[in-house]
A protein has these predicted regions:
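FIC/Doc superfamily catalytic core
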Residues: 1-294
Length: 294
């Protein structure tokens, strides 16, 4: 759980501090690593945010990373490559090549895999791709996690340094990221999001006793309107008085299923991402083929 929390914290850092067109620095990369391994023992690193000072090997790979003395120069070269002003049509290819090169350098003692996926997410933002729409339920870098065996196989192809191997790696990454970005775009369609994900998530939650009929009715109205206040719910809850509706809203707010649009507001929106409804959302996403069924 700590490891997952660290990744979430690092992604918040990326979203807050990196915008399209901005340079990615070595400090930024080292900061991602420091946040990723913070407070971890077995999955941590003795020197968070610092390049390794010893040799390393890579699990499931025959590639032997360069001696530690060369890491700073290789990382400087990589950062210059990522920030170089090339035609936009090459952006996704640069994402693919930067991901492989980082793995090839293996700049840190531990946590390289987690850090490079965060770096890849950062590059997509830097190059202007819309990857935040889905609230991070989907992450375009999932292409590297869905089939780990194929991921390492394609990395090995690129590790040869041959043009054919690098082409195969780029094709693998571009195809995967394209598929994931299409999923994100699909979730940007309000009708699809409501009918295929959010409403089914409510039914799933109601069927498992997470919410009752009244709570489901309130949440459905919020999904259709995006926000509601007490008067908006009188039509769908004709048997309840205003005070009773206010009480129901208060219970949902206490559970994190509703949240005011701003502090002190009496206008509310649904809270899916950090509540008991999240399991229903995951179930709906899995049913629609958005996430793998492990």
């Amino acid at each position: 759980l700590k490891e997952i929390g660290n990744i979430g914290h690092a992604m918040n850092f990326i979203d807050e501090h990196l915008h399209a067109g901005e340079d990615i620095t070595e400090y930024f990369v080292r900061e991602l690593h420091a946040m990723t391994v913070n407070g971890l023992e077995r999955e941590g690193d003795k020197t968070p945010g610092a390049y390794r000072s010893h040799g390393v090997s890579i699990a499931q790979s025959t590639h032997l990373p360069p001696e530690f003395i060369h890491v700073p120069a290789y990382m400087q070269e990589l950062v210059e490559f990522m920030n170089r002003a090339d035609a936009p049509k090459y952006d996704l290819m640069k994402v693919a090549l930067a991901h492989h090169r980082f793995g090839w350098i293996h700049p840190f003692g531990n946590g390289n895999g987690r850090t490079v996926r965060l770096l890849t997410y950062s590059l997509l933002i830097k190059y202007g791709f819309n990857v935040k729409t889905s609230g991070r339920v989907l992450n375009p870098t999932a292409v590297f996690c869905n089939d780990r065996e194929r991921y390492y196989s394609m990395l090995a192809e690129a590790d040869t340094g041959a043009v054919e191997g690098l082409e195969q790696w780029c094709l693998y990454v571009l195809t995967g990221i394209s598929a994931e970005l299409k999923k994100v775009d699909k979730l940007s369609n309000l009708h699809f999001l409501n009918s295929k994900i959010l409403y089914p998530a409510l039914e799933y939650s109601k069927g498992r006793g997470v919410i009752n009929e009244t709570e489901s009715t309130i949440l459905k109205r919020i999904i259709s309107q995006r926000t509601v206040k007490v008067n908006d719910l009188k039509e769908v809850l004709p048997g309840l008085k205003s005070a009773q509706i206010t009480y129901q809203i208060g219970k949902l707010v206490d559970r994190g299923l509703l949240q005011p649009v701003e502090m002190g507001s009496r206008i509310y929106t649904a809270g899916f991402s950090k509540s008991d409804l999240m399991r229903g959302v995951i179930h709906a996403l899995r049913k629609e083929g958005f996430i793998p069924n492990f």
